[in-house]
A protein has these predicted regions:
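Conserved hydrophobic/aromatic beta-strand scaffold that supports enzyme active sites
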Residues: 49-51, 97-99, 109
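Catalytic beta-strand/loop cores that center a nucleophilic Ser/Cys/Thr
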Residues: 56-104
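Cysteine-nucleophile active-site neighborhood
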Residues: 7-62, 68, 126
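Positively charged, low-complexity/disordered segments
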Residues: 1-6
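Short histidine/acidic/glycine/proline-rich micro-motifs that form metal-
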Residues: 75-76, 115-117
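Active-site-proximal beta-strand elements of phosphoester/diester hydrolases
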Residues: 69, 108-112
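Acyltransferase
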Residues: 116-135
């Protein structure tokens, strides 16, 4: 039998071929590690807002830029271990990864909490994601 850490990338890729996947916070980190990236500790940012910069397309189409977003975490994706199959699609002004997308499949991760009242335009992000189709 496969251990969970071995099965997770297989599960994410198989499901992500059929339906869009969105990992938020720990789910974002799970997607990042599933494809080979590393997670590191950082200073806790629980209930804090920061500006996030994005490319104003895909999930971020029509979203303010920078986006004021709520963060609740003490772990982050280690940027120099970004898997070759993933694109960084949003980050903080000091380069912390805030969103990723798989290059071939509709598999996304958000480090911040789009569902939080502390995230401006969070409803737009969720609407954009829910309207995505598998190509």
């Amino acid at each position: 039998t496969l251990a969970l850490h071995d099965a997770l990338p297989i599960f994410i890729l198989e499901v992500g071929k059929k339906i869009p996947i969105l990992g938020v916070c720990l789910g974002h980190q799970g997607i990042f590690t599933a494809f080979g990236g590393e997670i590191i500790r950082t200073d806790p940012v629980h209930g804090k807002q920061c500006h996030i910069y994005h490319q104003n397309k895909g999930m971020f189409q029509g979203v303010s830029n920078p986006l004021l977003a709520a963060r609740y975490h003490s772990l982050i994706c280690k940027k120099d271990t970004t898997p070759s199959s993933m694109d960084i699609i949003a980050e903080t002004d000091n380069g912390i990864i805030m969103a990723i997308k798989h290059q071939d499949y509709p598999i996304y991760g958000l480090q911040f909490h789009s569902e939080s009242i502390g995230t401006h335009d969070g409803k737009i992000i969720m609407k954009n994601f829910l309207e995505m189709k598998v190509s």
